[in-house]
């Protein structure tokens, strides 16, 4: 249903970075819903059950996300079941890769290289939204910073962001439950002075009570 698909959207997340864009920061905004193709998954994170007939020479990654139904093309959602009535054709998959997935990552690569070459270092901030989390013993984080446990960026970046969130009385966490995925793995390159971090923002911080439209936050 449309309500279920909303859970797969980083709804209005581009508005979170509008001030940075206005200040001159380079930004690349995805305009395809995650249900269509997940840009935060590798090409081999494709569930073989999603394609008919099978793609020649294709070997799936067997990643945990893919096996859980949230691969390159999400197949199912918890409490919602299957998202597609039938498997997709191999031509459809290739079209989505060639027209959306590959150009998106190529644009990121080019932008990071240009910035690194100009300033000596570059930082990718990968902005997403998340559903409100639940917690028991302590307040649930409303912002989660991911650096793949220090693999995609020096810890200084994450520490600065968490400190900033807490200074605004917003509960923040590091790498739990979202450490970052393919975008950070692909584009973070510490040896090349290109660093990458992920920011997950609780949708209730900036959307209305129905989590559909921009709110007062």
Question: What are the functions of these language-model segments?
Answer:
Residues 1-124, 129-217:
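N-terminal catalytic or cofactor-binding beta/alpha core of small enzyme domains
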């Amino acid at each position: 249903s449309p309500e279920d698909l909303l859970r797969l959207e980083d709804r209005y997340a581009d508005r979170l970075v509008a001030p940075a864009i206005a200040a001159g920061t380079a930004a690349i905004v995805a305009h395809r819903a995650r249900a269509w193709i997940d840009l935060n998954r590798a090409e081999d994170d494709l569930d073989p059950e999603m394609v008919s007939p099978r793609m020649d020479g294709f070997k799936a990654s067997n990643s945990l996300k893919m096996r859980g139904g949230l691969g390159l093309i999400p197949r199912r959602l918890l409490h919602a079941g299957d998202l597609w009535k039938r498997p997709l054709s191999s031509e459809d998959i290739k079209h989505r890769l060639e027209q959306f997935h590959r150009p998106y990552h190529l644009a990121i690569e080019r932008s990071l290289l240009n910035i690194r070459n100009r300033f000596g270092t570059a930082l990718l901030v990968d902005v997403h939204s998340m559903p409100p989390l639940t917690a028991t013993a302590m307040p649930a984080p409303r912002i989660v910073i991911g650096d793949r446990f220090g693999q995609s960026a020096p810890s200084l970046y994450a520490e600065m962001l968490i400190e900033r969130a807490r200074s605004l009385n917003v509960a923040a966490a590091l790498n739990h439950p979202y450490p970052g995925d393919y975008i950070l793995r692909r584009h973070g390159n510490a040896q090349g002075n290109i660093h990458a971090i992920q920011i997950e923002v609780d949708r209730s911080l900036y959307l209305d009570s129905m989590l559909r439209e921009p709110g007062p936050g």
